[in-house]
A protein has these predicted regions:
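Cytochrome P450 heme-thiolate "Cys pocket" and heme-binding signature region
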Residues: 435-476, 501
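Classical protein tyrosine phosphatase
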Residues: 322-347
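Conserved cytochrome P450 K-helix E-x-x-R motif and the immediately C-terminal K′/meander segment
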Residues: 71-79, 355-401, 413-414, 420
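Cytochrome P450 heme-binding "Cys pocket" and the immediately downstream C-terminal segment
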Residues: 341, 462, 468-505
Length: 528
């Protein structure tokens, strides 16, 4: 029997008569009842935390309403919960069931807790078992292959990638922004996405593939569609997702993207294998290409881990491109609304690049630019709750709360906008962290790549984002080109507010800016 072309959403009226097999009615009814109960019944929560308030309660057959409330109004739900319950944990129904939300004050207590699992938290969401999300399994795998590659290989390689990043950044910025000295309107997010995709691909796959238009399109499409497909799928209860994913439009797109990625990466791997065989046969040194393809292969062999190279490249591209694109766009939006800071930033960029050229130390010394990036991330992080973890063994917190094995927790990110921590927290203060560097004991904490209990845009503790050091350099290189070569201002009437979807808080995807190439640039940074 042919598969149906589309699956009705759970909000539609189904034509059950057309779906019920006449000879299998008892089995269909049983299956239907299981599906309904699975959809309606809340995820189980141990009685030890039943005393915690549930901030978006759902009764029998009303789970859908609670999840829709979370998807539309997570920010206001969190705000009301803080107001009502103060610094106490509470429960919340999300797309992935019920979770315990811990206030930010608990972040130092749990940051390195071995009974809380990062990979387990991802595995519980059960998407990595589906073919279109196979790349996600690389991130959630307990072997930590991807994280190891970033920590051991990419971070070690940072001093060697600054010049390639600068070269690719110059090309990508010119390609997207043009050379016109007349003001023109620009859709911000697509341009920033392309710039970051090109720069990241230069480091991950080398100069040849980073110019491959099909690969660039794949990485950009995957970055955009992966999160949207997850959001689309999360509207359905977990037990149904293994069935409905076959019918969802964005899931179909992802499966096609995965196939295209394999078609591009497989010949590259085969070609490299042949080069190595030829070198070995000739008694020559076997080449190591020193990019993410070789890093992954090296670490996987050392760990004895099987993996799909194309899936690993997609996930590596996703984690690098998704967050960096978002923050780069947010920084430009913030600067466009505060042009008074631009001359001082340009002065810093020119001073450091003129003195030392495109070096890792030059980027490190751009402390005002560093402060701006950290402030934009503080004011608009990529989410409202962070540090998703699953409890692997019963754990009692300092307040006496017993977290039982199998439960899930998130940490509220409100502390990054708390007036008790930051003065005027709702304002964008570009020198906030630059000034903080002068305070005793806070010079290190004020750096963009440093995580703390007061600023955890990259997470905190053992599982803090290992790629933040690369992201810092990549963003600074991109901003050097964008700010030194171009003038910026908001397009009239453009939207600037973040897009809220559940706990996600994305830089405005429809924002538009006006941009023009500067005529008299203080330093030719393309020839240093």
């Amino acid at each position: 029997m042919a598969s149906p072309s589309a699956l009705p959403s759970l909000g539609q009226d189904w034509n059950y008569q057309s779906l019920i097999p006449t000879k299998s009615t008892p089995y269909f009814i049983l299956t239907l009842m299981v599906m309904i109960v699975a959809y309606a019944w809340p995820s189980s929560t141990d009685s030890s935390v039943k005393k915690l308030p549930l901030v978006n309660p759902a009764g029998f057959f009303s789970m859908k309403q609670a999840k829709q409330q979370y998807r539309r109004s997570a920010k206001s739900i969190l705000k009301n919960a803080r107001k009502q319950y103060g610094n106490q944990p509470f429960r919340m129904i999300t797309d992935f069931g019920e979770v315990v939300i811990l206030p930010s004050e608990f972040i130092d207590e749990i940051r390195n807790e071995p009974k809380l699992s990062f990979s387990g938290g991802l595995e519980q969401e059960r998407t990595s078992q589906l073919p279109e999300f196979e790349a996600f399994a690389i991130l959630s795998n307990r072997s930590q292959l991807l994280q190891t590659v970033v920590k051991k290989q990419l971070t070690k390689f940072l001093s060697k990638v600054t010049e390639p990043l600068a070269q690719e950044g110059a090309h990508a910025v010119s390609l997207n922004l043009g050379e016109s000295q007349e003001w023109r309107e620009l859709a911000l997010r697509p341009a920033m996405l392309d710039i970051i995709a090109r720069m990241s691909s230069r480091v991950f796959l080398g100069e040849e593939i980073c110019k491959n238009k099909e690969w660039l399109d794949i990485t950009k499409e995957f970055t955009v569609n992966f999160t949207s497909a997850m959001f689309e799928l999360s509207a359905y209860p977990v037990p149904l997702r293994r069935f409905v994913h076959w019918f969802l439009p964005l899931c179909k797109v992802l499966r096609a993207t995965n196939s295209r990625a394999k078609e591009i990466i497989a010949p590259v791997i085969a070609k490299r294998a042949e080069i190595r065989r030829a070198a070995q046969a000739a008694g020559q040194e076997v080449p190591f290409f020193n990019d993410a393809l070789d890093w992954l292969d090296q670490e996987a062999k050392a760990m004895g881990v099987d993996y799909r190279p194309d899936a690993a490249q997609l996930m590596l591209s996703f984690v690098a491109i998704h967050t960096s694109t978002d923050l780069l766009g947010q920084v430009i939006l913030d600067i466009a609304q505060h042009p008074e800071i631009v001359p001082e930033v340009r002065e810093e960029i020119v001073r450091e690049l003129r003195a030392n050229g495109w070096k890792k130390t030059s980027l490190y010394n751009m402390k005002l630019l560093d402060s701006i990036m950290k402030e934009s991330q503080r004011r608009k992080p990529i989410g409202m709750a962070i540090m998703r973890r699953s409890v692997t063994e019963d754990l009692r917190l300092s307040n006496g709360l017993l977290l039982k094995k199998g439960m899930r927790i998130h940490v509220d990110m409100h502390r990054m906008q708390d007036e008790e921590v930051y003065e005027n927290p709702d304002e964008w203060v570009p020198k906030r962290f630059l000034d903080m560097r002068t305070q005793a004991g806070k010079e290190h904490l004020s750096q963009f790549v440093t995580t703390s209990g007061d600023h955890f845009g990259f997470g905190h503790g053992e599982h803090a984002c290992p790629g933040r050091f690369f992201a810092s350099n990549e963003l600074k290189v991109a901003l050097c080109h964008l700010l030194l070569k171009y003038d910026w201002k908001l397009a009239p009437g453009t939207a600037v507010n973040p897009l809220m979807r559940g706990f996600s808080m994305l830089s405005c995807p429809t924002a538009k800016v006006l941009v023009q190439r500067r005529e008299n640039i203080e330093l030719d940074i393309d020839s240093i």
